[in-house]
Amino acid sequence: MSKILFCKSKVFLHPTSDARDNIAGFLLLTLEANKLSHQAILQYIPESGLSTLEISKLLKHEAKVGTCPTSTPFVIENSINFSNLVNTSLGQAFEISLSQIYCIQFRPPSPNGWYVGSLVIYPLTEQFTGFQPPVLFFHDQLCPSTTDKLKRLRKSMNPFDDSDELYWGGVDLRNKINELMELKKSNLEPEFWLVNPSLNDLRNFVSKDLLESYNNSKKDTTELATAGVKLNEKFQEWKWNVMSKIADVTTKSTNFIDSWLTNNSPIQKSQIDNEYLQKLLNNEKVKQIEQDYDSARVYLANWSLGVKQEAERYQKQNKLFDSYRNNIFNDLNLTDELSDTEINNALQRQFPLTEAKWNSLWDENDGRLRVTVNEVKDFIFHGGLENDSLRGKVWGFLLEIYPWDSSQDERVQIDQTLAAEYDQLKLTWSKDFLQFDDEDEEEYWNDQLFRISKDVRRCDRNLEIFQYNTIDGLPPPPQQLPANENNSTSPESANDESDDADDGVRNPHLIHLQNILITYNVYNTNLGYVQGMTDLLSPIYVIMKEEWKTFWCFTHFMDIMERNFLRDQSGIHEQMLTLVELVQLMLPELSEHLNKCDSGNLFFCFRMLLVWFKREFEMEDIMHIWENFWTFYYSSQFQLFFMLAILQKNSQAILQHLNQFDQILKFFNELNGKLDWNDLMVRAELLFKKFEKMMHVMERDLQNVSSSSSSSSTGVLPCQSERLTLLLSKKPIIRHEGQRSKNSVK
């Protein structure tokens, strides 16, 4: 039994040039019961193989689903055996699964009616060697569903479909396939649409690099009409280039101002002979500017960075790919170190992993992954995940709840086991089971509960699900709101109870967070609860929703992050030392300048690394950043390269404007909400590739030195640094807290 998803009549085969030989038929999309959408079958059945009753039934289905919106439910067909029809249609019929199609060429009809629209199907060669489905021709003037829609469009004075293309019968099929699985238009040949493309297909055939040549090929009589728009785009591009240059000039000009103000101290002013200059320097306004110059430095640094970021953001949003590429190329000082492929792969981040694509990666029989894990991670790292619904499925794999090689049945068993284990862990801290051997343990436990409750009440209260501390999580009635609750931007002040209130947490989602953290305290008794864990837990809960699943994702995340929270701080200290060495190698000028500013230890980076930039970005951005990190696509410590990208991005502002520790600390503290995570991820990837090549070159040089008996090594090459070498590893660094004792400092 199959479901008819799409039906189009009067689709013809043209076996000869004689129109009398044309073969009329039906083009169908069907789906067997209990099959996934990407397993839908595209079928062509000639009318000659159908009875009058069957033709009548199909025409009724065409009226229902041929041009219906996506919300229309599937119609189940019981009386037509499609496979039998295909097999008995004398070789004129065919069927092919959508998952077996590489691409489809949709050739629209001639506007003047000289030829009809058609489509050409290109199967995957490894699955259909020697088989080429015939070209299908859409005789729209004979098809009832197409003519009906054309009448409606003409009546509305709009002959175009939703994508602003001239409507014809093939558009309906294309839209329906796009509902079922990923369908991407090629900029190289606009008539070609890739079906469920791989990431390499997207890079090769839907590349932004092709945008300019594609636009040039589209020039026609509309060129004059679009000239004004293009001129405006050119002006906008020029404007942002100029603004970016102004920021650079301002950066350089402050060198003169800095020198001038430094050399004109009160003692030196008396030595200046110029009467006018003396009068100017004695002016009260000038003195005030001089006294406020430290804060002005931070302002100038932020301003120049802001202009630069706005210019880059405009270039990306308006497809000015070459300009953005050149900016990155110059900023990172890339010469011939990286190949064009490496640079393009880093820059092309516009292809997220979609739900349809994700579903197509799994075997329909046992639910096992059909592609390599690296291919999936490539999609995630370079494009992210399409939406939160998909994150709820994928994060379980990234956080190792589910093995990548598991089957669907095995994952169901894992869910049942982990849910039961979580319930057992929760029981251990319930009032009926909780007992203490001594007063110290009881005091420690109560202190942990207090800390958890206190931090949970402060956790991401700007998010809707955590905003109101009410029993149902909804806004309280207006009469119950304090006077200052009219300001919805500060729900904490209106809804929070005092820190020592026993029933302070009422919001059901906050209660779930509290339960998870208390259970983790039992699960990892040596570490317990440490401030900052709520920052790590909140995004996972927002996605997973279920308490038990959130808990296990969090525990696996904490396996990676536990070294950041060790009591002796050795884990985070080791990362800071690694970052210092990395900056010395990759950004030597910045490293030297920071040392002069007493900031060479990079203390201002501490908080960012501690909770993986949670405080610097919005929730949606953090989800993108973390799922990139969790892939370990290049390195298990890729967060250090992301931090390196932040330093590199701001290096010119620091070098030219800031020269004191407190200025630098203030500057980085004010970066919250000002950073572009996507741009930083591009820079981080290119910096890693550059670092990787540098390490390989230095390792080769070191081997050459070692093999030469006449050579003697002086100093230590960077590749001999264990910390830097470890950055090339994809294996997570796991460090656990030691045994907790009564004397442990919490």
UniProtKB/Swiss-Prot annotation:
GTPase-activating protein (GAP) that most effectively accelerates the intrinsic GTPase activity of Ypt/Rab-type GTPase YPT7 involved in vacuole docking and fusion. It is also active, but to a lesser extent, on YPT31, YPT32, YPT1, YPT6 and SEC4. Provides a catalytic arginine (arginine finger) in trans to accelerate the GTP hydrolysis rate of the substrate GTPase. GO terms for molecular function: GTPase activator activity. The gene is GYP7. Keywords: Cytoplasm, GTPase activation, Phosphoprotein. Residues 470-505 are annotated as: Disordered. SMART domains: TBC. GO terms for cellular component: cytoplasm; cytosol; late endosome. Residues 481-491 have a biased composition (Polar residues). Its main location: cytoplasm. It holds the Pfam family RabGAP-TBC. Gene3D superfamilies: putative rabgap domain of human tbc1 domain family member 14 like domains (1.10.8.270), Ypt/Rab-GAP domain of gyp1p, domain 3 (1.10.472.80). The modification Phosphoserine is found at S265, S339. GO terms for biological process: regulation of vacuole fusion, non-autophagic; vesicle-mediated transport. This is GTPase-activating protein GYP7. It is found in: Cytoplasm. Residues 385-633 form the Rab-GAP TBC domain. The record marks R458 as: Arginine finger. The keyword Cytoplasm applies. Present with 2460 molecules/cell in log phase SD medium. Changing R458 to A/K: Completely abolishes catalytic activity.
